[in-house]
């Protein structure tokens, strides 16, 4: 089982509420245990419930890879300590790093795997370099399909990538070279182009919004290297 449809309290926008890497999944608090178990079974990593300033939209606010997870600088110390404690319990060697910038929706503005990161051109060059240093990867500033919200417009793992359907062939080639995986265009949740908001994915599998169609699932599996 490497792909499953799921909803979070009837919302198909799973990526808004979580961050998935090859080491761990951070997900909003309050989900039913049976849904947490689906995520564990499909993504095959520990699933840790978390909040940021009591907000549930942690996929919008945070992002990361196996090396580090970036969170807004204003996250409460108690929330950071709770995540770090859970990481220690599971033996997860991933840093949690509050990142000081005027932009708080880090999950919307950063797209990353364990090989590279694409950050919105809204970030300064110095900020981009710092993000790359924290994540331990090569970093570039740019857009996808003319959009600054590169983290919402795409999803990328260490095996593949899927981005907004209006991305050009030139962008796909550039993204493939950057992330060192094949990158395709596609949608989820019955035509939603902001695929990063619709799913949680890592190299082991993907959970997608429950509105995702059969043809979309086939494309997602292909793009993320799961078939």
Curated annotation (Swiss-Prot):
It holds the Pfam family eIF-6. It comes from the Archaea. InterPro entries: eIF6. GO terms for molecular function: ribosome binding; translation initiation factor activity. GO terms for biological process: cytosolic ribosome assembly. SMART domains: eIF6. Keywords: Initiation factor, Protein biosynthesis. Belongs to the eIF-6 family. Binds to the 50S ribosomal subunit and prevents its association with the 30S ribosomal subunit to form the 70S initiation complex. PANTHER family: TRANSLATION INITIATION FACTOR 6. This is Translation initiation factor 6. It comes from Pyrococcus abyssi (strain GE5 / Orsay). The lineage of its organism: Archaea, Methanobacteriati, Methanobacteriota, Thermococci, Thermococcales. The gene is eif6.
């Amino acid at each position: 089982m490497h792909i499953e449809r799921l909803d979070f309290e009837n919302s198909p926008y799973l990526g808004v509420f979580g961050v998935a890497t090859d080491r761990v999944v951070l997900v909003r608090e309050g989900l039913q245990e049976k849904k947490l178990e689906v995520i564990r079974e499909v993504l095959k990593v520990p699933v840790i419930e978390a909040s940021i300033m009591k907000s549930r939209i942690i996929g919008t606010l945070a992002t990361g890879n196996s090396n580090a997870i970036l969170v807004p600088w204003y996250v409460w110390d108690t929330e950071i300590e709770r995540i770090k404690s859970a990481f220690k319990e599971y033996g997860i060697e991933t840093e949690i790093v509050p990142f000081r910038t005027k932009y708080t929706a880090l999950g919307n503005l950063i797209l990353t795997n364990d090989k590279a990161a694409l950050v919105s051109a809204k970030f300064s060059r110095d900020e981009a370099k710092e993000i790359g240093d924290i994540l331990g990867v090569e970093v570039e500033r740019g857009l996808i399909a003319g959009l600054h919200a590169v983290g919402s417009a795409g999803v990328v793992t260490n095996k593949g990538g899927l981005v907004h359907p209006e991305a050009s062939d030139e962008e796909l080639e550039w993204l493939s070279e950057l992330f060192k995986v094949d990158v395709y265009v596609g949608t989820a949740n019955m035509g939603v182009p902001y695929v990063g908001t619709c799913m949680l994915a890592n190299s082991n599998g993907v959970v997608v919004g429950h509105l995702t169609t059969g043809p979309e699932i086939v494309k997602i599996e292909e793009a993320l290297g799961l078939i």
